[in-house]
């Protein structure tokens, strides 16, 4: 399911931190809005576990879609991250499934975002 963390930074600092990290890693940004950033990463390797649970993605690419939402005030922002698998991305047969397994939505990515945003956020 969703992972969440409270960050001592404002939403704009969090948005900038997500965008900077994605750019550094070469992760495509699908949406960049004031209170939400959506990242997409193409799954290039075979993944039998995803095939077994969600069916094959044989009419288009399979992607992980990472949605990070954030809302709050200058030094208190709640960040919520959800991860989805998208079969046949960008086709008429596109299917989106929420991933609930913790290995697909690791908490350490949110902890890294928290550290980066708080170091830039100017809050004590």
Language model features: what each stretch is:
Residues 1-124:
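Ser/Thr-rich, low-complexity intrinsically disordered terminal regions
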